[in-house]
Curated annotation (Swiss-Prot):
Single GO BP term: cytoplasmic translation
Gene name of the record: rplF
GO MF, one example: rRNA binding
UniProt cross-references to InterPro entries, sorted A to Z: Ribosomal_uL6-like, Ribosomal_uL6-like_a/b-dom_sf, Ribosomal_uL6_a/b-dom, Ribosomal_uL6_bac-type, Ribosomal_uL6_CS
Protein name: Large ribosomal subunit protein uL6
Gene3D superfamilies membership: Ribosomal protein L6, alpha-beta domain (3.90.930.12)
Family, similarity comment: Belongs to the universal ribosomal protein uL6 family.
PANTHER family membership: 60S/50S RIBOSOMAL PROTEIN L6/L9, LARGE RIBOSOMAL SUBUNIT PROTEIN UL6M
One GO cellular component, as annotated: cytosolic large ribosomal subunit
Function of the molecule: This protein binds to the 23S rRNA, and is important in its secondary structure. It is located near the subunit interface in the base of the L7/L12 stalk, and near the tRNA binding site of the peptidyltransferase center.
Matching NCBIfam families: L6_bact
Length: 176
């Protein structure tokens, strides 16, 4: 049984959390995030600690999810989130043209992508992409969209992958 909903969230100095109806806003040194939360779950703030209580066991899943989401928001406005990706394959390269990310990954045309608001894309080298921002959900979603342009294939391992991702390799046909 998960007890994540009962864990206390420590609010660091410089971060303010305000509740306005069903919306909770977190402001910090890196920016501001607002999210809608279930009205049935009550938020209690005592000094620099926040905890949540639920009315009954039917809200177990929502209880843990709300606590995890608020903790992700606090971490986002203080430290931020970052996904590092690399391109593996002959001729595969990435470049930044203005606000667009341009990927040449073996198609007959370059793939152009625009990062969502609040997400910054850096291309330190032609085979490396760094996606960063304050919202864990938006950063992860955009990284998944970039990866889906050319997901790593199991035979040669070519494609766009996360730096810490392990691609399971398959053996090719043996032939006669």
């Amino acid at each position: 049984m998960s007890r994540i909903g009962y864990k206390v969230i420590k609010v660091p100095a410089g971060v303010t959390i305000t509740k306005d109806g069903d919306n909770i806003t977190v402001k910090g040194p890196k920016g501001e995030l607002t999210r809608h939360f279930a009205p049935e779950i009550e938020m209690h703030q005592e000094g620099d600690e926040i905890n949540f209580t639920r009315p009954d066991d039917s809200y177990k899943a929502v209880h843990g999810t709300m606590r995890a989401n608020l903790n992700n928001m606090v971490v986002g406005v203080t430290e931020g989130y970052k996904k590092e990706m690399k391109l593996v394959g002959v001729g595969y390269r990435a470049q930044k043209q203005g606000e667009k990310l341009v990927l040449n990954v073996g198609y007959s045309h370059p793939v152009e992508m625009t990062a969502p608001k609040g997400v910054t894309v850096e291309v330190p080298s032609t085979t490396q992409i760094i996606i960063s921002g304050i919202s864990k959900q938006v950063v992860g979603q955009f990284a998944a969209v970039v990866r889906s342009v050319r997901a790593p294939e199991p035979y040669k391992g070519k494609g766009i992958r996360y730096v810490d991702e392990h691609v399971r390799r398959k053996e090719g046909k043996t032939g006669k």
